[in-house]
Amino acid sequence: MWFLFALGSAIFAALTSILAKIGIEGVGSNLATAIRTMVVVIMAWGMVFITHQQAGIKDISQKCWIFLILSGLATGASWLCYYKALQMGDASKVVPIDKLSVVITLILAFVFLHEEFTFKSVIGCILIGAGTLLMVL
């Protein structure tokens, strides 16, 4: 089941890039990011209430709060950079560079989360990096 959600994420992320590139014409990148973020906030809280998870907010530990806030700050910084890059460059070049986050995530997961980094992972990272270079050059 996780695979279907991951595939859905990839499909929606692809749609996001195209819709954002079209929608950002004539709009400041920071304003566009703020509008997008408002929609995401409304949608996310809607899902919390639809699934009756709002009561769980009181059970979130201080550590979880800190890391969720840090994650939110990183997401915001990522979106601000992404929208500015998308406004200035071609989606066909911006998106592959943005997807280098896969390689960076694998490395960070190995360093900080002590997740396994196999030979297959190394080859995959090299191929993603090479593919990104091929697409943007």
Please place each PLM-identified region on the residue numbering.
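Membrane-interface interhelical linkers
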Residues: M1-I11, V27, V40-F67, W79-M88, ...
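Hydrophobic/small/kink-forming positions within alpha-helical transmembrane segments
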Residues: A10, A14, I18, W45, ...
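Juxtamembrane helix-loop-helix junctions in multi-pass membrane proteins
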Residues: L15-V40
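Hydrophobic/aromatic residues within transmembrane alpha-helices
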Residues: G23, A32, A85, V111-L113
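Cytoplasmic-side transmembrane-helix entry/capping segments in multi-pass membrane proteins
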Residues: S29-T37, Q62-L68, V95-P96, S121-I126
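Helix-helix packing/entry segments at the starts of transmembrane helices
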Residues: L31-M38, L80, L86-L106
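Hydrophobic transmembrane alpha-helices of multi-pass small-molecule transport proteins
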Residues: A44, K120-V136
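C-terminal transmembrane-helix exit sites in multi-pass transporters
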Residues: V102-V122
